[in-house]
Amino acid sequence: MSEPIDLSQIAPTLKAEILAEALPYIRRYHGKTVVIKYGGNAMTEERLKQGFARDVILLKLVGINPVIVHGGGPQIDHALKKIGKAGTFIQGMRVTDEETMEVVEWVLGGEVQQDIVMLINHFGGHAVGLTGKDGGLIHARKLLMPDRDNPGQYIDIGQVGEVEAINPAVVKALQDDAFIPVISPIGFGEDGLSYNINADLVAGKLATVLNAEKLLMMTNIPGVMDKDGNLLTDLSAREIDALFEDGTISGGMLPKISSALDAAKSGVKSVHIVDGRIEHSVLLEILTDQPFGTMIRSH
């Protein structure tokens, strides 16, 4: 077991200030669920990985219920490269043939998930890994990708799914027993196939079904940026639609922002896009009043 974080070098008055600032937020979120989409640099840099593990443990210790949905794009790309296969994306979604799906399952449900679970447990937490196939968690259907160049037509991108339904029973059971669920975004279809589902979409749907108080989506940029590279700290549904139209939001940000907006419209009270490259970004967003990232609003 790793030694706990050494706070001896922090002056007592500063410790008191930190705790005093956090206390109202601890009270506000006590007993509430926070869904965190975990990805990007925060999953690959050791310092950030350790900081994230400690953050979610602290949340659990103060009575907040974190639920983690993780990505793993770089790890999947690396595994595909080993077998001589290139990754292909359309509108931010990975084209997933049968061979790619096999790689996705063992990378996300094995290597990536277990790395997260082991790190949380190493620092004294109690995490349990799941895929959407466990406990009937995520029912999926094949995603029909609209062809933007041919209205009314669709592009076949293989075993890529969208969430048809979520059965949260297994997640709630783990929460009740003081575990931290770590979920790989793989669903199962009525056709018996596994489906690769964008982790942002899973996080948004799960936050809605769990009646989460907050949804955090970690990324490798400060938040949503305008065309001049300036951070947009607060976005309404109308403003987001305009950014979609003019191409400011594109590529991998499309499913992320769409999912965030859907969650906000579905009743998730607080939805934020945060910079996962900043150490302890989860705690900074939840337990301080420091403006951070981009807030997504439904109105």
UniProtKB/Swiss-Prot annotation:
SUPFAM superfamilies: Carbamate kinase-like. Keywords: Amino-acid biosynthesis, Arginine biosynthesis, ATP-binding, Cytoplasm, Kinase, Nucleotide-binding, Transferase. It is found in: Cytoplasm. GO terms for molecular function: acetylglutamate kinase activity; ATP binding. Its main location: cytoplasm. Catalyzes the ATP-dependent phosphorylation of N-acetyl-L-glutamate. NCBIfam families: argB. The gene is argB. It is an enzyme of class 2 (transferase). It comes from Burkholderia vietnamiensis (strain G4 / LMG 22486). It catalyses: N-acetyl-L-glutamate + ATP = N-acetyl-L-glutamyl 5-phosphate + ADP. Belongs to the acetylglutamate kinase family. ArgB subfamily. Substrate binds at G72, G73, R94, N196. The record marks K37, K256 as: Transition state stabilizer. GO terms for biological process: arginine biosynthetic process via ornithine; L-arginine biosynthetic process. Its EC number is 2.7.2.8. GO terms for cellular component: cytoplasm. InterPro entries: AceGlu_kinase-like_sf, AcgluKinase_fam, ArgB, Asp/Glu/Uridylate_kinase, NAGK-C. Pfam families: AA_kinase (PF00696). Transmembrane segments: none annotated. Pathway: Amino-acid biosynthesis; L-arginine biosynthesis; N(2)-acetyl-L-ornithine from L-glutamate: step 2/4. This is Acetylglutamate kinase.
